[in-house]
Amino acid sequence: MKKIIFYSYLKCSTCRKAVKWLDKENLEYQLIDIVEEPPLSKYLNLAFEQNSEKKRIFNTRGKAFKSIDLDINGLSREKIIQLLLSDGKLIKRPFLIFGEKIILGFNEAEYSNHLL
């Protein structure tokens, strides 16, 4: 079975909901603090490939994102990845890796579809 890598932020209520769901479904996962250890650039690149909108990869509701005044659409993928790696709070969370699939945020139906 593929390994689930789950990047989370302890203060994030959506992350806590996702953890409860994973536990309820008895799924094993590796839990990583997204602030202390952001996802590797290869996973951020996968997220880009799987999401057509650049902004989707960002935690747009967080203070870290709101404090930067950038035209994300004007930045290259490389610049965006550097920015995301510099501050894990900028990354949409939870950030779940399952094989080659990246799931951003928590949607129970999407988790069920890909993980069960």
Residue ranges and their predicted role:
Residues 1-25, 29-34:
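Local sequence-structure signature of Cys/Sec-based thiol-disulfide redox active-site neighborhoods
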Residues 36-116:
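Thiol/selenol-based redox catalytic cores and closely related redox-interacting motifs
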